[in-house]
């Protein structure tokens, strides 16, 4: 059944029907479409816009359709134009002429926006829940590796000694921001558009606030033209997902590097690795590589929607139907990526001794030698030059800083004493950095406490979302 006709004298071409159809992808919103329709028709009855007995009969029919679809007894007809027309035609088949009153006072324009917002509200809660699961994994990893020394890098060159906990907690901060962004995005999603009609509301005395309350929205939208033209909520969601995927991708890149034979910082579990069809020795980090690759896909989904919307006049245009495939793909890709990534890092093995050995080379404690001289009264810029010359000497002699004798140290400055050896011990280098945000155990404990509190507070916020 088509939801339009009358003024047409010819049948629409079959190719146009296929081109125009959205049932193949918007059918996933059948629950939201039915729930929205139940709220709408309940309001129609209570406001005496249609007879109350008709309202109850329609609502009962919609519940029956919902139950049968959930149970798999009723199958969605893919020849329908969209999920809205399928639900309405099925309703009329079930209950008769009263079903034709369902669409009183609304348009597909405000209906589809309602469905999408309801769907997104539910999906965002699922996404936040999965990011919190990932944060719990990072919390455990960091708690177990407060003293696991590793080299920190800049420009992919060894820079200063840090701990694995410090490194892991850097990513936890990124994911905290992702959760905060999604919660903020949810606030703007929480505006109910139904009642906006095609563009100029309706002449029926509908009660939009009542529908909003029934559906768990905090308020109604204030301008009907904007309500049916708006896809900011979809674009903003995809923007949040793009940032989230970027963070997963950066983490994946490091997982890939760390798992190489050249690094061996970690070993991925067999259950999250794959092999080669020709090289029997291979153990490939395909999960991390796919997360890295799928990030570009989510970026593409965002660019699709931005491009669709960039030149559209008010109000609704059929171009806007192109929002859903990109939106749904971005949602599904991100959710699967988070869940799989979490499993990968939860099961990976940390090679602590190799990390520490790596941190012991590459002069990662050079900055601490300069800081030592500063504490002895040398200006930092002079100390920097002294240590630069010292490093050049070490390179020429094939020595590490730790292996220099005191007399060799004194060749560069008479400020060096026996206490230099304690100052350049890697654990000392780390523990001296007690500044908020640093790698010392005391600082890491604070970061872990903050992460634990954030997880608890976010769960509480999640439970309050309608």
Swiss-Prot record:
GO terms for biological process: arginine biosynthetic process via ornithine; L-arginine biosynthetic process. InterPro entries: Arg_succ_lyase_C (IPR029419), Argininosuccinate_lyase (IPR009049), Fumarase/histidase_N (IPR024083), Fumarate_lyase_CS (IPR020557), Fumarate_lyase_fam (IPR000362), Fumarate_lyase_N (IPR022761), L-Aspartase-like (IPR008948). It holds the Pfam family Lyase_1. It is found in: Cytoplasm. SUPFAM superfamilies: L-aspartase-like (SSF48557). It is an enzyme of class 4 (lyase). The gene is argH. Keywords: Amino-acid biosynthesis, Arginine biosynthesis, Cytoplasm, Lyase. Its EC number is 4.3.2.1. Its main location: cytoplasm. The lineage of its organism: Bacteria, Bacillati, Bacillota, Clostridia, Eubacteriales. GO terms for cellular component: cytosol. GO terms for molecular function: argininosuccinate lyase activity. It comes from Clostridium perfringens (strain ATCC 13124 / DSM 756 / JCM 1290 / NCIMB 6125 / NCTC 8237 / Type A). PROSITE patterns: FUMARATE_LYASES (PS00163). PANTHER family: ARGININOSUCCINATE LYASE. Pathway: Amino-acid biosynthesis; L-arginine biosynthesis; L-arginine from L-ornithine and carbamoyl phosphate: step 3/3. It catalyses: 2-(N(omega)-L-arginino)succinate = fumarate + L-arginine. It comes from the Bacteria. Belongs to the lyase 1 family. Argininosuccinate lyase subfamily. This is Argininosuccinate lyase.
């Amino acid at each position: 059944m088509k939801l339009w006709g009358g003024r047409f004298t010819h049948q629409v071409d079959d190719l146009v029907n296929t081109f125009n159809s959205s049932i193949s992808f918007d059918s996933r919103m059948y629950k939201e479409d039915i729930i929205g329709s139940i709220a709408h028709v309940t309001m129609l009855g209570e406001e005496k816009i249609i007879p109350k007995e008709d309202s109850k009969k329609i609502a009962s029919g919609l519940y029956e359709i919902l139950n049968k679809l959930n149970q798999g007894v009723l199958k969605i007809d893919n020849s329908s134009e969209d999920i809205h027309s399928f639900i309405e035609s099925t309703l009329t088949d079930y209950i008769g002429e009263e079903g034709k009153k369902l669409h009183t006072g609304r348009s597909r324009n405000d209906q589809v926006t309602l469905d999408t917002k309801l769907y997104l509200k539910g999906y965002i809660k699922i996404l936040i829940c999965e990011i919190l699961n990932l944060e719990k994994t990072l919390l455990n990893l960091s708690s177990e590796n407060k003293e696991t020394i590793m080299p920190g890098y800049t420009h992919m060159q060894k820079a200063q000694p840090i701990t694995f906990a410090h490194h892991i907690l850097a990513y936890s901060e990124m994911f905290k921001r992702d959760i905060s962004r999604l919660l903020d995005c949810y606030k703007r999603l929480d505006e109910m558009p139904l009642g906006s009609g095609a563009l100029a509301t309706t002449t029926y005395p509908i009660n939009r606030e009542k529908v909003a309350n029934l559906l768990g929205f905090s308020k109604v939208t204030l301008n009907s033209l904007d309500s049916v033209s708006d896809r900011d909520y979809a674009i903003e969601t995809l923007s949040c997902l793009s940032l989230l995927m970027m963070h997963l991708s950066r983490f994946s890149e490091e997982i890939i590097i760390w798992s190489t034979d050249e690094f061996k910082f970690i070993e991925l579990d067999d259950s999250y690795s794959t092999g080669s069809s020709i090289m029997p020795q291979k153990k490939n980090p395909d999960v991390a590589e796919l997360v890295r690759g799928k990030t570009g896909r989510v970026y593409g989904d965002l660019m699709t929607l931005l491009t669709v919307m960039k030149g559209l006049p008010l109000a609704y245009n059929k171009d806007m139907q192109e929002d859903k495939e990109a939106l749904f793909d971005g949602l599904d890709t991100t959710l699967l990526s988070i869940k799989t990534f979490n499993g990968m890092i939860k099961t990976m093995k940390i090679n602590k001794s190799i990390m520490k050995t790596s941190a012991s080379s590459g002069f990662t404690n050079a900055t601490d030698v300069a800081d030592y001289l500063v504490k002895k009264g040398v200006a930092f810029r002079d100390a920097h030059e002294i240590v630069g010359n010292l490093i050049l000497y070490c390179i020429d002699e094939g020595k590490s800083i730790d292996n220099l004798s005191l007399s060799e140290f004194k060749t560069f400055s008479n400020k060096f004493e026996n206490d230099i050896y304690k100052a350049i011990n890697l654990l000392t280098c780390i523990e001296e950095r007690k500044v908020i945000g640093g790698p010392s155990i005391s600082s890491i404990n604070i970061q872990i406490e903050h992460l634990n509190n954030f997880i608890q507070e976010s769960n509480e916020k999640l439970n309050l979302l309608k």
